[in-house]
Amino acid sequence: MSNTIKMVVGLGNPGKEYEQTRHNAGFWFLDELAWKWKASFKEEKKFFGEVARAALPDGDVWLLKPATFMNRSGQAVAALAQFYKIKPEEILVVHDELDIPCGRIKFKLGGGNGGHNGLKDIQAKLGTADYYRLRLGIGHPGDRNLVVGYVLNKPSAEHRRQIDDAVAKSLQAVPDIISGKWEEATRFLHSK
């Protein structure tokens, strides 16, 4: 049986100044997943990002951290997907989510972009919204005028702990997600 998910994308912004910001929660997840799978990232200019290949028992899974800024993430996703002939429904995108309380997780296929510029660009470049999303809750600042500053700043120590806990819990669901056991993954991830 081969893997159902063939590419996992973590969204974030490149550069030291963004490393610890809420908007980079997808990168945090992908770094942990690469460590768990003993996969090493390498800069790949033709894919506009850092790429790692995880050789798993049921086939390779590609890990991608776009080196474009968030609003150009689709360029990297589409380049890797086209090169390796990966269909949108074989892609998992892991990203920060304002509309979910800090530390909570949601998993879904398709849907709107919720104003997330990375998702908007991925949808535009793939021509569809039908890819999987692992949404890591970062909470909302309470006022939409504060959103940009909120996502581009470091979380408090308590919020960082909650996000790290969500990443750890999400990693436990990865085997089910990769193998297409959607109901099991959803039930686990959506439980408190």
Swiss-Prot record:
Single GO BP term: rescue of stalled ribosome
Keywords: Cytoplasm, Hydrolase, RNA-binding, tRNA-binding
Top-rank EC class of the record's enzyme: hydrolase
GO cellular component annotations of the record: cytoplasm
Catalysed reaction, written as an equation: an N-acyl-L-alpha-aminoacyl-tRNA + H2O = an N-acyl-L-amino acid + a tRNA + H(+)
Bilayer-crossing regions: none
PROSITE patterns recorded: PEPT_TRNA_HYDROL_1 (PS01195), PEPT_TRNA_HYDROL_2 (PS01196)
Statement: the UniProt record of this protein carries the keyword Signal: no
CDD domains: PTH (cd00462)
Subcellular location, record wording: Cytoplasm
InterPro entries cross-referenced by the UniProt entry: Pept_tRNA_hydro (IPR001328), Pept_tRNA_hydro_CS (IPR018171), Pept_tRNA_hydro_sf (IPR036416)
Site (Stabilizes the basic form of H active site to accept a proton): 96
Feature type site, description Discriminates between blocked and unblocked aminoacyl-tRNA: 13
Active-site residues from the entry: 23
EC number: 3.1.1.29
Family from the record: Belongs to the PTH family.
Protein name: Peptidyl-tRNA hydrolase
Organism per entry: Neisseria gonorrhoeae (strain NCCP11945)
